[in-house]
Regions:
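Eukaryote-specific, cytoplasm-facing alpha-helical/coiled-coil scaffolding segments in long proteins
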Residues: 222, 290, 326-329
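Residue-level signal for short amphipathic helical patches enriched in basic/charged
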Residues: 269
């Protein structure tokens, strides 16, 4: 395997023309089936070294059995989130991460790296966190893996982004709705195959409010009315529009099904899985005053109670994959 990277050379091909050959001294081969595997080994080494140098400098949590948990990194390929419960700890974690990456010749993109404080105030704290001497920009929201994460832990901005994305892709194929030779079945397939996945990307993790659910359903009705060729001046009821299109389940109901699918998946995990342990754990510290924000489990509770069962009963059902799948697909009276 090592021989693949000794005296490696490459060129750039554009059409039928090729550039001069040049030496490749860093990085992995583009398109090689081994590259993802090799990168995982490499980044795992970085993570382990940083963790060893920053013990006890993550976000403290208490597990279901009372054990101490420290969460200091979220990883997906080369997208990394470093976490700490104080500015001093975050400085240390980021500093050590930068040193380890530099020693292993992995470049940290300072321009794309941001700092964010998570609290109810959702305001900037003027943090001074640096990588290789360069100060990182502080923001009150940022996009991670396609979703918007905000400092106050609200989901509204992410939902609005998905609504905007759904309307954008719907508008891109809007001319197709006027094609008379395209049947409603074909239009419905396009809507469900393009618009719905865009609007509900990442919805499994949402804890939505009534307002957020209304945004999704309003966007959907705009799309369905356009597919039918009717507008509000025609005074056609939403129920009739849905009957014509052949879609009875609302977008918010589809979102509930995705949330329940993910809930069942987590409940079936082994108790020693990190995801399950974090799911069962509680963050250290006291709750701040005021009305608590809509939590993810609140959405789960709402969805299962609409189907006529309690959360405790739903937890029992989740362990049988086939039974849970049928339960998730069950149409409530609101969606029937």
């Amino acid at each position: 395997m090592k021989s693949f990277y000794i005296e490696s050379r490459a060129c750039v091909r554009v059409g039928d023309e090729e550039s001069e050959w040049f030496a490749v001294e860093v990085g992995l081969r583009q398109g090689c089936v081994m590259s993802p595997w090799l990168f995982n080994i490499f980044i795992d080494g970085v993570v382990r070294e940083v963790r060893a140098r920053t013990l006890g400098r993550g976000v403290g949590m208490v597990g279901e059995r009372g054990e101490e948990l420290q969460v200091n990194q979220l990883l997906f390929a080369d997208d990394t989130v470093l976490m700490a419960d104080s500015e001093e700890k975050l400085r240390r974690v980021v500093c050590e991460f930068g040193k380890v990456c530099n020693r292993r010749k992995l470049k940290v993109n300072v321009n794309k790296s941001k700092v964010m404080v998570c609290n109810r105030r959702a305001q900037l704290e003027n943090l001074d966190v640096r990588v290789e001497g360069e100060r990182l920009e502080e923001v009150d929201d940022f996009k991670y893996l396609g979703g918007v994460i905000t400092g106050d832990a609200s989901i509204g901005m992410d939902v609005q982004q998905r609504v905007n994305g759904g309307m954008k892709v719907f508008g891109a194929v809007k001319s197709m709705w006027k094609v008379k030779s395209l049947s409603m079945k074909g239009k419905r397939a396009m809507y469900q195959g393009i618009v719905v996945p865009t609007a509900l990307y990442g919805a499994e993790t949402w804890g939505t409010s009534v307002r957020d659910r209304r945004r999704l359903d309003v966007m959907e009705m705009k799309c369905l009315r356009s597919m039918c060729g009717v507008n509000r001046r025609d005074r056609v009821r939403n129920e009739e529009v849905r009957r014509r299109v052949g879609i009875q389940e609302t977008l918010s109901e589809r979102m509930d099904r995705r949330v329940l699918s993910w809930y069942g998946h987590i409940e079936r995990m082994d108790d020693d899985r990190l995801t399950k342990r974090i799911y069962k754990a509680n963050a250290r510290g006291a709750r701040v005053r005021g009305r608590p924000k809509m939590a993810w489990m609140d959405g789960v509770k709402r969805a299962v109670e609409k189907r006529g069962v309690t959360v405790d009963r739903a937890k029992e059902l989740a362990y049988d994959r086939s039974e849970w799948r049928a339960f998730v697909k069950y149409m409530t009276n609101d969606a029937a």
